[in-house]
Amino acid sequence: MEMLEEHRCFEGWQQRWRHDSSTLNCPMTFSIFLPPPRDHTPPPVLYWLSGLTCNDENFTTKAGAQRVAAELGIVLVMPDTSPRGEKVANDDGYDLGQGAGFYLNATQPPWATHYRMYDYLRDELPALVQSQFNVSDRCAISGHSMGGHGALIMALKNPGKYTSVSAFAPIVNPCSVPWGIKAFSTYLGEDKNAWLEWDSCALMYASNAQDAIPTLIDQGDNDQFLADQLQPAVLAEAARQKAWPMTLRIQPGYDHSYYFIASFIEDHLRFHAQYLLK
């Protein structure tokens, strides 16, 4: 591992690291915020997954999460949104290829060689964080848009791994919206049954009651993608039918930007703290 940056921040440290990923077959960067130590108890971790076109720095520089994370004693880990590099398959569109990994394991050439973000987030990155930093094994997950999709599927596919999950303007039903259809047909092929494994609504309907964890979703009602790409009411209905403890908050006037995230990130951190710090 190589440290790329380090900055003092709210008595803690904001760092950026590069490491060689055996899962993704390329070098990867991630950002991490380490809160000031409180006692000898290792702090819990909140993983943040960003959206289309982003990397590990968008949340770090725009969300303003460090102040409350420092107060609460929560480590923040921000991975990149895809594998990257000259040898990594790419596409000219903003919503496919590098910067748009969709947090799944691709099965189609040429994507399958590198695009295994699900395995990276489930196994390799948490193991690396555990081995290199003084953190506890208690963790939660959150994300925005494509990253909200990622956070939800990570939680739904891994019962017991996370104490809680939250999302801002997530893509909840990718099998049925243009962003998801484009990505899934490219990364996974045309068999739509294979897509269901990566769709939060399908996973919610297939979930078991004993695996449910507290879930918070915020959605701006002035989001230009709300009707065509996001459709959170579809997941809310699935959660209702499964008696899954999910709160969906529609926030008047807010759009899809980091101004929206910055406005409510404190709520999300305090939501996760209730369960992370038990």
Curated annotation (Swiss-Prot):
Keywords of the record: Hydrolase, Serine esterase
GO molecular function ontology, one term from the record: carboxylic ester hydrolase activity
InterPro entries named in the record: AB_hydrolase_fold (IPR029058), Esterase-like (IPR000801), S-formylglutathione_hydrol (IPR014186)
SUPFAM superfamilies from the UniProt entry: alpha/beta-Hydrolases
Enzyme class: hydrolase
Domain of life of the native organism: Bacteria
Coiled-coil regions listed in the entry: none
Biological process (GO), any one: formaldehyde catabolic process
Matching Pfam families: Esterase
EC number from the UniProt entry: 3.1.2.12
Known catalytic reactions: S-formylglutathione + H2O = formate + glutathione + H(+)
Record: active site: S145 (charge relay system), D223 (charge relay system), H256 (charge relay system)
Function: Serine hydrolase involved in the detoxification of formaldehyde. Hydrolyzes S-formylglutathione to glutathione and formate.
Family: Belongs to the esterase D family.
Protein name as it appears in the record: S-formylglutathione hydrolase YeiG
